[in-house]
Amino acid sequence: MARFFKPQKRKITDTKHKEIVINRLDHLGAGIGHLNNKSIFVDGLLPGEKALVQITDDKKQYARAKVIKRLIDSPARIKPHCPIYDQCGGCNLQHLSHQGQVLAKQQALSDLMVKFAGDQQVAVDKQRAGDQQRALFEQVTPIIAAEHHYRRCARFSVLLGKDGQLQFGLRKKQSKDIVNVKQCPVLAESLNELLPPLRSLLSTLKGQRHLGHIELIEADNGRVVLIRHLKPFSDKDMTLILNFAQEQNVILFLAPTSDDIELIHGETPYYRLDDLTLHFSPKDFIQVNRDVNKKMVEQATDWLDLQPSDRVLDLFCGLGNFSLPLAKHAKAVVGVEGIDEMVHRATENAMCNKQNNATFYQANLDEDVTKLAWAREPFNKILLDPARAGAAGVMEHVVKLKPERVVYVSCNPATLARDSQVLLKKGYQLERLGMLDMFPQTGHLESMALFVKAKAVKKKRVVTKL
């Protein structure tokens, strides 16, 4: 049968400038307003602001727009601290006061949880409280620290331009182009001090064209520099690089491939946490905010209400950032991670800190982990700290273990809200919810939620107001 071509109708986006008033921020820091009963997302606008905008992406349920002109500014709007804020893609909330950022993120987190998990939460509440009116959950005071110079990890892009000049900096907003960075207001001060000599080194290398990107880390035993390169350095370039490492007293790694790194100068980096020493590789994930990480681990320990007889399961455990501090208060902690190398690192860290009650295993966390050998003994407390994609694959298996308490640490409130529904449908109560100010000046939102089995919920509840 012959098939006839039927051209699809071209969707025409209305590009006329429209006036909009912003009501709130979403969980990524974009302003939300409404036109013709449709939600419009606009980067760079704050609640209460009025602006002329132009639609850039028109969907059936929502649209995105860009600012043409601000007409009314919010009292919370401030001058960005960074001179290249309008160009750099690293931060997107420097135009909002730090207090305003914290309040907006806390509200966005609460709104998401009420929207996506509220129905199940209300059902559990009514069943347990005899239809009495009460708060859905305790919204605790956000964990905050310094608003500037908090970031102990950063990745810088390097490119030899057509004009022969070396570009060294961060990616521009919504672009692969590089904006040159001399100083960064969210980068740790010790790493900012390293930028001028590092730029000078890179500019003198003959192999500039073969540079990949540069990673900087502030470890507790020194500054770490990782140089990725596509071809081997010449002997002359290697001499310059080693001289730089010695003069600046940095821990230097070279990475000829995405998988291989080589320690060239200095010792294995580590950071201290709760009187523990955690060694890591530049390839490993560590939390970027040292102070918030410390408070976050303390809060997780408190929320789990650890007892000497507890057996704790730490899923997505990484190199032991939660597992090892938790092991100081529990009978046993089992950490599970999908990456072999991280499991090896966590095991070494447990041995280094003489924590014999912490053991680590590699497993695919999308599969039924309850069938694995280490899950034969029961766990009464569970902690999860997944990546942005969340823990959809493991949630059904978490409830099979029937823990008394579950602490979920999230870097994406949307997946936290989604995954929470599994626990709520199985009779767990969302007891506490808190925002962790891990990434000031950006729209990234870290959070922590506590779920408790219905029979373990205490009758007295205190709701913390911001």
From Swiss-Prot:
<feature type="binding site">
    <location>
        <position position="337"/>
    </location>
    <ligand>
        <name>S-adenosyl-L-methionine</name>
    </ligand>
</feature>
<dbReference type="InterPro" id="IPR030391">
    <property type="entry name" value="MeTrfase_TrmA_CS"/>
</dbReference>
<keyword id="KW-0489">Methyltransferase</keyword>
<feature type="binding site">
    <location>
        <position position="321"/>
    </location>
    <ligand>
        <name>S-adenosyl-L-methionine</name>
    </ligand>
</feature>
<dbReference type="GO" id="GO:0070041">
    <property type="term" value="F:rRNA (uridine-C5-)-methyltransferase activity"/>
</dbReference>
<dbReference type="InterPro" id="IPR010280">
    <property type="entry name" value="U5_MeTrfase_fam"/>
</dbReference>
<dbReference type="Pfam" id="PF05958">
    <property type="entry name" value="tRNA_U5-meth_tr"/>
</dbReference>
<protein>
    <recommendedName>
        <fullName>23S rRNA (uracil(1939)-C(5))-methyltransferase RlmD</fullName>
        <ecNumber>2.1.1.190</ecNumber>
    </recommendedName>
</protein>
<keyword id="KW-0698">rRNA processing</keyword>
<feature type="binding site">
    <location>
        <position position="88"/>
    </location>
    <ligand>
        <name>[4Fe-4S] cluster</name>
    </ligand>
</feature>
<keyword id="KW-0949">S-adenosyl-L-methionine</keyword>
<dbReference type="GO" id="GO:0051539">
    <property type="term" value="F:4 iron, 4 sulfur cluster binding"/>
</dbReference>
<dbReference type="GO" id="GO:0003723">
    <property type="term" value="F:RNA binding"/>
</dbReference>
<keyword id="KW-0479">Metal-binding</keyword>
<feature type="binding site">
    <location>
        <position position="316"/>
    </location>
    <ligand>
        <name>S-adenosyl-L-methionine</name>
    </ligand>
</feature>
<comment type="similarity">
    <text>Belongs to the class I-like SAM-binding methyltransferase superfamily. RNA M5U methyltransferase family. RlmD subfamily.</text>
</comment>
<feature type="active site" description="Nucleophile">
    <location>
        <position position="411"/>
    </location>
</feature>
<feature type="binding site">
    <location>
        <position position="91"/>
    </location>
    <ligand>
        <name>[4Fe-4S] cluster</name>
    </ligand>
</feature>
<dbReference type="InterPro" id="IPR029063">
    <property type="entry name" value="SAM-dependent_MTases_sf"/>
</dbReference>
<dbReference type="InterPro" id="IPR002792">
    <property type="entry name" value="TRAM_dom"/>
</dbReference>
<dbReference type="GO" id="GO:0070475">
    <property type="term" value="P:rRNA base methylation"/>
</dbReference>
<keyword id="KW-0408">Iron</keyword>
<comment type="function">
    <text>Catalyzes the formation of 5-methyl-uridine at position 1939 (m5U1939) in 23S rRNA.</text>
</comment>
<feature type="domain" description="TRAM">
    <location>
        <begin position="11"/>
        <end position="69"/>
    </location>
</feature>
<dbReference type="GO" id="GO:0005506">
    <property type="term" value="F:iron ion binding"/>
</dbReference>
<feature type="binding site">
    <location>
        <position position="364"/>
    </location>
    <ligand>
        <name>S-adenosyl-L-methionine</name>
    </ligand>
</feature>
<feature type="binding site">
    <location>
        <position position="385"/>
    </location>
    <ligand>
        <name>S-adenosyl-L-methionine</name>
    </ligand>
</feature>
<feature type="binding site">
    <location>
        <position position="82"/>
    </location>
    <ligand>
        <name>[4Fe-4S] cluster</name>
    </ligand>
</feature>
<dbReference type="InterPro" id="IPR012340">
    <property type="entry name" value="NA-bd_OB-fold"/>
</dbReference>
<feature type="binding site">
    <location>
        <position position="287"/>
    </location>
    <ligand>
        <name>S-adenosyl-L-methionine</name>
    </ligand>
</feature>
<keyword id="KW-0808">Transferase</keyword>
<keyword id="KW-0411">Iron-sulfur</keyword>
<dbReference type="InterPro" id="IPR030390">
    <property type="entry name" value="MeTrfase_TrmA_AS"/>
</dbReference>
<feature type="binding site">
    <location>
        <position position="184"/>
    </location>
    <ligand>
        <name>[4Fe-4S] cluster</name>
    </ligand>
</feature>
<keyword id="KW-0004">4Fe-4S</keyword>
<dbReference type="InterPro" id="IPR001566">
    <property type="entry name" value="23S_rRNA_MeTrfase_RlmD"/>
</dbReference>
<dbReference type="Pfam" id="PF01938">
    <property type="entry name" value="TRAM"/>
</dbReference>
